[in-house]
């Protein structure tokens, strides 16, 4: 299976980034693997140039990754684009998973495996909780929705 799995993420001040990194580290450690994290060192609106450089650096390394977990589908697509510069392609040379299950990731020529956050269910639940509050229900609730892995063809079968 994959042994050198890298997490490539966004800006350093994001709560979402911190939670995704923590989940990645926990999963890696549970499987006896060393977490490898590469995140931007500053906040930026356009992650493209940073992501490109990080990707080129990782794949030029003596021990390049055999799999990448990207912070988002957009990050994953930027990684895929940069890998092409080196003649690399997923899933032939490495596996990649995004996060968000965006419409672009579903396109057949990208076919990005992605983690779905079930945005529709999240939105519906948020409206339901808001209506309950408006109706006088002041209980504090915590709802946890399980993400779903949407398997497409950006990961090698192992």
Question: What are these regions, as identified by a protein language model?
Answer:
Residues 1-158:
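Bacterial carbohydrate/catabolite-sensing allosteric modules
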